[in-house]
Curated annotation (Swiss-Prot):
Protein's name in the database: Neurochondrin homolog
Gene expressing this chain: Neurochondrin
InterPro entries: ARM-like, ARM-type_fold, Neurochondrin
Gene3D superfamilies named among the record's database cross-references: Leucine-rich Repeat Variant
Domain of life: Eukaryota
Pfam family of the protein (one): Neurochondrin
Tissue specificity annotation: Expressed in both somatic and visceral musculature.
GO CC terms, sorted: dendrite; neuronal cell body
Family listed: Belongs to the neurochondrin family.
Role: Strongly up-regulated in Mhc mutants suggesting a role in muscle function.
GO BP, sorted A to Z: muscle system process; neuron projection development; regulation of neuronal synaptic plasticity
Length: 723
């Protein structure tokens, strides 16, 4: 009590001695003056808060049963004025009574109206001040989230009532804290809010336009992306953002305007994808983005001190994100560029990535590479990520420098992968860390076929990390329903089977893509490093993983491409490790059945309009660009495996596959069987005949003679019937 000023002590004593609400209210005018004075410290405010008693302040805020000598608004105004001062102290702003008053404060701001007379607007302003102070501390933030403050504030801003900027700043403060969980599953409030801000940004020609860019970026990045994308029909805010950002890119602007615009563009591309850049069905905006991103990267990374470059981390990360989206889209060959545009684009990108490479090389040799500062670490991740995106497309340039830098890039990528694994194994708070290794996989596909790069990869035991990554992403793609506690099983028996959430489905899609890239790299390793594939413990573990997990994979259209990749990877590994395979190994038996199913189901005549034409099956047709080469490689590798593991031929016979091939080809019209398909089937059947004495009789019974004649299968004919 000694540090409480004397006037404050006297006032507190007076308040405690009051015998009626009227007396207490009269004393409050003295409190108002005191708490706003410079002499009233935190201890003094706490003493006054306790002397008044929160129930009395709340009564002034909400009760209609008050003395008639003042209008209710005056009571409310005095109470809020005092509360605002109290809330400036953390101990009081986080006090249970004040936290419990949040719904009352929200109600006051929700009822605001531009038409309200001035006194009411002062009340609303004070209520916002209280909410802002409460939102500055963790207990208040949690309470605001729980009471639905974000959708309510969104509604206030969308309706454009009084002091809506206060509502907007509260929203930004909260969404920055809570991220995705800020928003309910119903995206209505989110769409309404973004539409209002986007329209304001599009039509505003003052500096506020750029402030709104920053606010839009901060809010957009926290959305429930899958839900928002699936509910975009009828929404016009993507178009407002497109027009607003387009106007900014055309204007003469400085860094103060350009930086928030780039921030918003990068975030919008992250949420809506690259198609947003083609909303007017022209390529101008896309090319402007690419040029601006590349120029900014060159300027910010050009021969500066590393500390200076790292200070621009946020801006550069946005530019990297824009360039990654542009590069990924250009790789799809959907962009029709004139020769001059191609040259300009390539020159811009090459200039930018020469700087990126130079900076990353300096980072790899500087003490900053060991920095424990999360922002520095995140920026290094971002540099490796964007360079990896470029190297996935640029497969020849800068090779000596890249090989030299590759160990550092792998170290960074592997570290980010371990961070993601740890995050998923824990409570999963906040945004998931970005797996730079996953982004690097397409570039590693190229490195896997380059001898020098492959040497670096094996020296740094990257094959072990890639197997770990395959196991990790398979666990995500192979979604299993959460286990039900034993005590609840009976009452939940009739519940429908749970399905993955939209967020989980998005994760599964990313995981499947990673598995395909990982299989590609590991296949190249297996073929190009046969000795390691035969003797290396990592490759033994890899085969074990494939044969145990492929049969478990759900038979769904989404899984077909990873099924094919794992099946063929397994065959390549079986071929190299054939000496170690034990006859009738149960897991190998199950694996080979799953592999036969993949190879068998690719072609048929049942689904053809012409009953004499062999066609790719409907299930495979939509994915055939990804499966065609795999299927031929699978058939070819099966031919290589059979002489080494002859007992596998039993499965081709017992399953009816060998007989099925002959019966199908028998119905195919002469001269219509594609040469590569004919070779694949003929080589396979010939190998079966060579390794298994029972095959001849089965094929002859199925009328293999006619098939050999019709489709000119000379080699198979000789094996079955002699010359």
């Amino acid at each position: 009590m000694t540090d409480v000023p004397e006037p404050v002590r006297k006032c507190a004593s007076l308040l405690k001695g009051t015998k009626s609400d009227t007396e207490k209210f009269a004393a409050l005018f003295m409190v108002t003056k005191l708490v706003k004075g410079k002499d009233c410290n935190a201890a003094g405010k706490k003493l006054l808060f306790e002397a008044i008693g929160f129930p009395f302040l709340k009564k002034l805020l909400v009760s209609k049963d008050l003395p008639n000598d003042c209008p209710p608004l005056v009571y409310k105004s005095v109470a809020l004025s005092i509360l605002t001062c109290f809330c400036q102290e953390e101990e009081l702003a986080t006090h249970k009574d004040i936290i419990d008053a949040i719904p009352t404060l929200l109600e006051i701001v929700e009822q605001a109206d531009d038409e309200d007379y001035e006194d009411n607007l002062i009340v609303v302003s004070e209520a916002y001040s209280c909410l802002k102070s409460i939102a500055s501390h963790e207990p208040g933030q949690q309470a605001l989230l729980a009471t639905g403050a974000i959708p309510k504030m969104s509604q206030i801003y969308s309706a454009q009532s009084f002091q809506t900027d206060e509502a907007l700043h509260l929203i930004v403060l909260l969404v920055k804290q809570f991220g995705v969980v800020s928003w309910p599953e119903d995206p209505t409030a989110f769409h309404a809010l973004i539409q209002r801000i986007a329209l304001d940004m599009e039509t505003d020609d003052t500096e506020r336009k750029y402030e709104l860019c920053r606010i839009l970026a901060d809010i957009l990045i926290t959305c429930r992306r899958e839900i928002v994308i699936n509910s975009l029909e009828g929404q016009i805010w993507p178009e407002s953002l497109f027009k607003g950002c387009g106007d900014i890119l055309k204007a003469k602007i400085g860094p103060k305007q350009r930086d928030p615009a780039l921030h918003l563009i990068a975030t919008t591309l992250h949420v809506l994808g690259i198609q947003w850049a083609f909303m007017d069905e022209q390529k101008t905006f896309f090319l402007q983005l690419l040029q601006l991103g590349a120029i900014e990267v060159r300027m910010q990374m050009d021969e500066k001190k590393l500390e200076t470059t790292f200070k621009q981390a946020e801006l550069l990360t946005c530019c990297f994100s824009i360039l990654e989206h542009c590069i990924e889209y250009m790789a799809t060959d959907q962009l029709d560029l004139e020769p001059k545009e191609k040259q300009t684009t390539y020159t811009a990108l090459k200039g930018a990535f020469n700087q990126v490479l130079a900076v990353l090389t300096r980072v790899s040799q500087d003490k900053i590479r060991e920095s424990s500062n999360p922002k520095d670490k995140k920026f290094v991740f971002a540099i490796v990520k964007v360079l990896s995106a470029w190297l996935a497309q640029e497969t020849t340039a800068m090779r000596p420098a890249i090989y030299k830098l590759l160990p550092f890039m792998l170290k960074v990528a592997n570290e980010s992968f371990q961070e993601l694994k740890t995050w998923r194994a824990g409570t999963r708070e906040g945004e998931p860390p970005i797996d730079v290794l996953r982004i690097m996989l397409p570039a590693l596909c190229h490195f896997a076929v380059e001898e020098e790069a492959r040497r670096v990869l094996f020296t740094h035991k990257q094959d072990e990390v890639l197997l770990e990554s395959l196991e990790f992403y398979f666990s995500i793609a192979h979604w299993k329903r959460p286990p039900i506690p034993r005590a609840e099983r009976l009452k939940r028996m009739n519940e429908p089977d749970p399905v993955p959430t939209p967020e989980q489905q998005a994760e599964m899609k990313v995981a499947r893509s990673a598995i395909v890239a990982l299989c590609n790299i590991l296949m190249n390793f297996t073929v190009l490093e046969p000795k390691k594939a035969e003797d290396g413990p990592t490759f033994a573990n890899l085969l074990k993983f494939v044969v145990e997990n492929l049969p478990e994979l759900k038979d769904t259209p989404d899984n077909l491409v990873i099924h094919g990749n794992l099946a063929v990877l397994g065959l390549l590994l079986l071929k190299q490790q054939s000496k170690k395979v034990k006859q009738n190994d149960f897991s190998i038996c199950r694996y080979i059945q799953a592999t036969i199913r993949f190879l068998w189901d690719a072609y048929n005549i049942d689904e053809s309009n012409d009953p004499t034409a062999l066609v790719v099956s409907i299930a495979y047709k939509g994915y055939w660009s990804d499966l065609s080469e795999l299927w031929f490689l699978g058939m070819q590798t099966m031919c290589g495996v059979l002489p080494l593991v002859p007992w596998l031929s039993e499965f081709a016979l017992e399953s009816g596959w060998a007989e099925g091939i002959v019966k199908t080809l028998k119905k195919v019209k002469i001269g219509t069987l594609p040469a590569n398909v004919k070779s694949a089937y003929e080589d396979f059947l010939s190998q079966l005949v060579d390794v298994n004495g029972d095959v001849q009789a089965v094929l002859k019974k199925a009328d293999a003679l006619r098939v050999c004649r019709n489709h000119r299968m000379m080699d198979l004919g000789k094996k079955l019937f002699g010359d």
